[in-house]
């Protein structure tokens, strides 16, 4: 059976892990890091960069670098590069493709199956978009798992036999979740992890803390230099990077200095930024962001119907929880309970995803995971009211049916509008889509019986159907108002992703050919210069002409022309060796043995490009004097 990986697809960074011998291992990427920046860039030469290399060039390529795309999942957001538009799913697929490739390099085998995590508070459209991104990247998405649930799975399996309540406080780069889970083991060491309640804010994360520092720095420059940097894209990118660094430094230090030279230009010359930021200042400017974490926490405690004293463990997830102010607010909210420091907040979600992948694949048979739907699900009924069929925090998978009727006499069809959320009126909630049940037999209003069934699978993805009990006609939901991609669109994007991989391979091969050709030009020119006095003019002229032709080919884009001119130069260069050997023999005959041997031997290799060692024949040189 093929190996399945667990992927934490984050706003700022992503992580991939796998089970080895039943135990989870975080896989380092090609750059040697265990976390991969969720950054995608399109270079001006057309190359697609992903991860650390994309992040490093962001300042010089602002308009073609995409970050924090996770915040756009499940929306109609698109970005245009070189007259081609990309959806959030396509950009996320580039990140997933990079993680897939790194996992394949580590494991030495193809990887097709994956469990991908999402914030617990992701709605149906956001979950479906994540699944689509996995498909575009060439992955078979076994399961979509909530991030706090994955973290609790990684943490909870190491716990003892008693039932315990674990609170997971997950503050990532762009999203925030709080989940309460019950973890227990029986005598056979079989673990059951059940989510009791979950809540969150999909528009709150470390990016918002960074932005507050950026806004402060922009105002400082405006006050001191009279220049507004808010429209200067390159300056803003430098400020964003400096803000992220400052935020991290303030997690361990009480103050930091932000210094950026030549940030922009003013009437008085270049602008140099040099600002000191204390932890107290930082906490003051982000106080309202911290306040926003409290409501979801209180909602979870209320929904679960427990007291604070019932919480056994508090687990912090996401890099943003390293901020001291976040740790302090968690302690305050939980009545002074010290958060657990035994897990890596950046990696624990991917570890849990790998464990769940192992459970699905049958590698781990000692755990059962029971998740919940984070938001209530319902349809719009007369008066615009939201009639809920499935309440939030219902264990999934689940299926519920409800019978509705017509609002008018002889109504031939009903339009069923599906919503997700907690508000009393449908228009205030998230519209998932609409579908129509037609062919209803003529009857007075209130008489037809329309059975609407909601089915939420283990991924938290919604399926809806409606059936007229009178005629037996049935209609399943095809989302028309949501952001789910149609199958043909996904297929097209998959093909484009495969073509992109082939293009990368071709581009890499071309780069290798060019490097070899440039090396040949350099070594040949060096040889011509060093042996100018010993080479006949006709040989030197022929080789110089071949060098010039290869240089011209290298200036163009035709790689076949480069290969042809490279072969021509390699052939012409062999004449240098022949000429130098002839010169050496003449000098030996004139009584000066060995004087030109080094030059001749150097020339012998001049026409052989790097990597062509297969054509070299090893031979033993026999000293004629010894034989005598």
Curated annotation (Swiss-Prot):
Molecular-function GO term, any one: ATP-dependent protein folding chaperone
Top-rank lineage group of the source organism: Bacteria
Keywords: ATP-binding, Chaperone, Nucleotide-binding, Phosphoprotein, Stress response
Keyword Chaperone: yes
Low complexity biased stretches: 584-610
Acidic residues: bias regions: 611-628
Pfam families to which the protein is assigned, alphabetical: HSP70
HAMAP family recorded: DnaK (MF_00332)
Name of the protein described by the UniProt record: Chaperone protein DnaK
Designated gene of the protein: dnaK
């Amino acid at each position: 059976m093929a190996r399945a990986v667990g992927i934490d697809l984050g706003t700022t960074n992503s992580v991939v892990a796998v089970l080895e011998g039943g135990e989870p291992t975080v896989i380092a990427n090609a750059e040697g890091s265990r976390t991969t920046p969720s950054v995608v860039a399109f270079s001006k030469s057309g190359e697609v960069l992903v991860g650390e290399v994309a992040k490093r060039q962001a300042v010089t390529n602002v308009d073609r670098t995409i970050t924090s795309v996770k915040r756009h999942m499940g929306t109609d957001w698109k970005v245009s590069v070189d007259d081609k538009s990309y959806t959030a799913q396509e950009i996320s697929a580039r990140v997933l493709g990079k993680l897939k490739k790194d996992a394949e390099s580590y494991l030495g085998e193809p990887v097709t199956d994956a469990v991908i995590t999402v914030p617990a508070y992701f709605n149906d459209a956001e979950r479906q978009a994540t699944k689509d991104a996995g498909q575009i990247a060439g992955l078979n998405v076994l399961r979509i798992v909530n991030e706090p649930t994955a973290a609790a799975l990684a943490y909870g399996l190491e716990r003892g036999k008693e039932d315990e309540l674990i609170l997971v406080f997950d503050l990532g780069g762009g999203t925030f979740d709080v989940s309460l889970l019950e973890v227990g083991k029986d005598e056979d060491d079989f673990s059951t992890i059940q989510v009791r309640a979950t809540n969150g804010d999909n528009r709150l994360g470390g990016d918002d803390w960074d932005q507050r520092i950026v806004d402060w720095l922009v105002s400082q420059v405006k006050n001191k230099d009279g220049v507004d940097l808010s429209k200067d894209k390159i300056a803003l990118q430098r400020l964003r990077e400096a803000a992220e660094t400052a935020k991290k430094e303030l997690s361990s230090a009480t103050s930091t200095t932000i210094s950026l030279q030549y940030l922009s230009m003013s009437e008085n010359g270049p602008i140099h930024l040099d600002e000191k930021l204390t932890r107290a200042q930082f906490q003051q400017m982000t106080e309202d962001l911290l306040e926003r974490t409290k409501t979801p926490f209180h909602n979870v405690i209320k929904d679960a119907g427990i007291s604070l004293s019932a919480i056994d463990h508090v687990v912090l997830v996401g890099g943003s929880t390293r901020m001291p102010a976040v740790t302090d607010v968690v302690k305050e909210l939980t009545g002074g309970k010290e958060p657990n420091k035994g897990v890596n907040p950046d990696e624990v979600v991917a570890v849990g995803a790998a464990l769940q992948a192992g459970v699905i694949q049958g590698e781990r048979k000692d755990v059962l995971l029971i998740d919940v739907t984070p938001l209530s699900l319902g349809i719009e009924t007369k008066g615009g009211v939201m009639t809920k069929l499935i309440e939030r925090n219902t264990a999934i998978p689940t299926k519920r049916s409800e019978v509705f009727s017509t609002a008018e006499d002889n109504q031939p069809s009903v339009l069923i509008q599906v919503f997700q959320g907690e508000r009393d009126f449908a228009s205030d909630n998230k519209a998932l889509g609409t579908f129509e049940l037609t062919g209803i037999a003529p009857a007075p209003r209130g008489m037809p019986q329309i059975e609407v069934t909601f089915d939420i699978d283990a991924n938290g993805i919604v399926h809806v159907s409606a059936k007229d009990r009178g005629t037996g006609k049935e209609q399943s939901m095809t989302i028309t108002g949501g952001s789910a991609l149609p199958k043909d669109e996904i297929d097209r994007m998959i093909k484009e992703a495969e073509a992109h991989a082939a293009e990368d391979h071709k581009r890499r091969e071309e780069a290798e050919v060019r490097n070899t050709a440039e090396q040949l030009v350099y070594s040949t020119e060096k040889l011509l210069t060093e042996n100018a006095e010993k080479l006949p003019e006709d040989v030197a002229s022929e080789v110089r002409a071949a060098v010039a032709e290869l240089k011209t080919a290298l200036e163009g884009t035709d790689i076949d022309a480069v290969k042809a001119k490279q072969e021509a130069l390699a052939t012409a260069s062999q004449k240098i060796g022949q000429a130098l050997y002839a010169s050496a023999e003449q000098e030996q005959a004139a009584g000066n043995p060995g004087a030109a041997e080094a030059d001749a031997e150097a020339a012998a290799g001049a026409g052989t490009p790097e990597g062509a060692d297969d054509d070299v024949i090893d031979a033993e040189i026999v000293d004629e004097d010894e034989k005598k």
